[in-house]
A protein has these predicted regions:
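C-terminal "post-core" interaction segments
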Residues: 1-177
Length: 177
C-alpha cells in the first residue's frame, strides 16, 4: 500500500516510534529494509557462533528516496532503535526527538525441561556503523525538548456520547433514542 502511494506522488513520511518498546527482530529488519536500497541493517555479536548475526537490505526502497522523518523518545527501545539506527546510519531518515532507551541486547529463550524456560542475554545489537545501542540508545539528529501536556479536570467540558443527538444506544439494556 505504501508503494502505491509512493507511485502516486507521496512526498515523504513520518515514522512515529515514540514510546514503541520494540518487538521482533525480523520485523525491525523488514521495516528498515523497506526503506533501504542496500547495505547492512543490523548485526549482532555474542560469545557463540550462533549469536553472530548480520542482516542486509535487499534492493528496492518502497519510497524511492522520498524523505523520512523518524520520531523517537526515551520510550523507543529494542526493535524501534534498530529501525532508527539503520535509517540514521544510511542517512535515509532524519531522526527527531529525544535519546532512545538503549536496549541493544539479544535475548534467547532456553528450554529447561518440558514446561519451563529461561530468557538469557546472548548478544548485543550493532547499528550499520558498528555502534552498540546498549545503554546509549540512538541520539537524534534533531533534539526536541519534552512537551508538557496538562490534563484538565475530567468533569469540565466533558461531552459524553449519550449527550449527542442521534447517539447509538445499547438495545439490550432497554435504552431508546
Amino acid at each position: 500500500r505504501l508503494q502505491r502511494k509512493a507511485e502516486n506522488g507521496l512526498r515523504g513520511i513520518v515514522l512515529d516510534l515514540r514510546n514503541n518498546p520494540g518487538g521482533v527482530l525480523d520485523a525491525a529488519v523488514a521495516v528498515s529494509d523497506a526503506f533501504l536500497d542496500r547495505g547492512r541493517v543490523v548485526s549482532a555479536s555474542g560469545r557463540t557462533d550462533e549469536s553472530q548475526l548480520e542482516f542486509d537490505a535487499q534492493p528496492g526502497d518502497v519510497l524511492e528516496g522520498a524523505p523520512i522523518v523518524v520520531l523517537v523518545d526515551e520510550g523507543s527501545a529494542s526493535a524501534s532503535e534498530i529501525v532508527a539506527g539503520a535509517l540514521q546510519d544510511h542517512q535515509r531518515a532524519v531522526i527527531m526527538g529525544r535519546r532512545t532507551f538503549g536496549k541493544g541486547s539479544v535475548q534467547t529463550i532456553v528450554p529447561i525441561g518440558r514446561q519451563a524456560a529461561i530468557k538469557i542475554t546472548t548478544a548485543r545489537y550493532y547499528t550499520p556503523s558498528g555502534s552498540s545501542i546498549q545503554a546509549s540508545g540512538i541520539e537524534p539528529d534533531i533534539l526536541l525538548a519534552p512537551v508538557k501536556v496538562e490534563l484538565t479536570d475530567s468533569s469540565q467540558d466533558t461531552v459524553r456520547e449519550s449527550q449527542l443527538e442521534g447517539h447509538l444506544t445499547n438495545d439490550a439494556a432497554g435504552e431508546t433514542t
